[in-house]
Amino acid sequence: MAGLKRRASQVWPEEHGEQEHGLYSLHRMFDIVGTHLTHRDVRVLSFLFVDVIDDHERGLIRNGRDFLLALERQGRCDESNFRQVLQLLRIITRHDLLPYVTLKRRRAVCPDLVDKYLEETSIRYVTPRALSDPEPRPPQPSKTVPPHYPVVCCPTSGPQMCSKRPARGRATLGSQRKRRKSVTPDPKEKQTCDIRLRVRAEYCQHETALQGNVFSNKQDPLERQFERFNQANTILKSRDLGSIICDIKFSELTYLDAFWRDYINGSLLEALKGVFITDSLKQAVGHEAIKLLVNVDEEDYELGRQKLLRNLMLQALP
């Protein structure tokens, strides 16, 4: 009975180790989903399992968490099988709870520092000027505006990696001192950020190339499997169309946001298709279909926005 009286705020014993891996325990998930189930939902669920849960077990069910624990004791739910729970939630039309049936811990929602700063400055600076200046002023000559997409560093002679990041290792004391001197930014210097763009061309299908070209007549099953694996690996390496890695430098927050929007909505991919999927590449691959894969690290984008925020703050200073 002590386990049935456990409060939702209490931590289950198995949850301590799983918190380090960004996971919920199964019982913690029961707490989250069960607290959102109404008494009517619990009655309907208990009625649906009248033939599965005995009278004594059903008499101990007081809320949604107790019902889910009863399902676990009956072997209907475990850490690798939520199918029964998902099906029951769909039956009682509680589709709003389906995203919570997971052991993956949700990330805490944090306010965006850039949006927060823009909102504060729009109230602090824009509004007073609008009230104090009833007559519109002539537009001031703006500074030289950089292009929409800054110049990127990437090779022009084929799919080679252009700029490799330094290997992570333990540097010497002298190099650490030099790095400290060079990395320290000037407070008045304009900050920039680097966004790494990865572009790769691939065949859409490899089955046609592997069929009929992978064969082994060795008697031992392990040797036969190993030889076929080596043959398939050699064929796939020969079909590698290469990749390009570019570091794009941004100094304006608006251009960085525009670049990220184009990446999210697919405009960047469509624009790069005309650059990388050339007529010579199509002629080399023949009639096989190829696709272009584009990747930008979201973490680089978020760190870059925070870094370029400093430029806006410096511009706002008198």
UniProtKB/Swiss-Prot annotation:
Its main location: cytoplasm. Widely expressed with highest levels in testis. Pfam families: DED, TRADD-like_N. Keywords: Apoptosis, Cytoplasm, DNA-binding, Nucleus, Repressor, Transcription, Transcription regulation, Ubl conjugation. GO terms for molecular function: DNA binding. Residues 25-103 form the DED domain. Exists predominantly in a mono- or diubiquitinated form. CDD domains: DED_DEDD. Residues 128-147, 160-191 are annotated as: Disordered. One of its GO terms (cellular component) is nucleolus. It is found in: Cytoplasm; Nucleus, Nucleolus. InterPro entries: DEATH-like_dom_sf, DED_dom, DEDD/DEDD2, TRADD-like_N. Interacts with CASP8, CASP10, KRT8, KRT18, CASP3 and FADD. Homodimerizes and heterodimerizes with DEDD2. This is Death effector domain-containing protein. It comes from Homo sapiens. The gene is DEDD.
